Amino acid sequence: MPIGKLTLATLGCLLLWTATVAAGAAQKEDALKVGKKGEITLSQQAKVGNVVLQPGTYVVQHRVSRGDHFVRFLELKEVKYSTTEINDTYTEQDNAGEIKCRVEPATGRIQQTTVYTVTDGGAVRITKVAIKGENVVHVF
């Protein structure tokens, strides 16, 4: 094969390889990052975003998707069932809602999961959540 054709073939292969690498790099994979979680108990009905949470125990969990931050509220329900002479119970999680939030830096690592609320016209509204072990506060 003459040098000119060999050079042209080499350049063609190099161009094809470059296009393949560039196409692979352009396909960005979105990672769903799930942060720490904590458990809270609400003694009265509370609103967060446009979701109303009933009194009860919830697992709160932070997650990040495509750069947006969310807090998920999973209600813990005790379910009783009796298939034998012994009445057994187990805890079931029910997704009560997931609310978009923004994060603000905390003064340090959060020592205890805490929910901050305000009362608007007699209704309780959750304004922010701090989850044990994290170093940010989730603001609604």
What are these regions (language model features)?
Residues 20-25:
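Sec/Tat signal peptide C-region and signal peptidase I cleavage site
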Residues 62-95:
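Mature extracytoplasmic domains of secretory-pathway proteins
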Residues 85-140:
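Beta-strand-rich cores of mature extracytoplasmic or soluble domains
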Residues 27-47:
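Short acidic, Pro/Gly- and aromatic-enriched capping/linker segments at domain boundaries
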Residues 1-11:
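Bacterial N-terminal signal peptides that target proteins for export
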Residues 56-61:
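A short tyrosine-centered beta-strand micro-motif
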Residues 10-19:
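Bacterial N-terminal signal peptides
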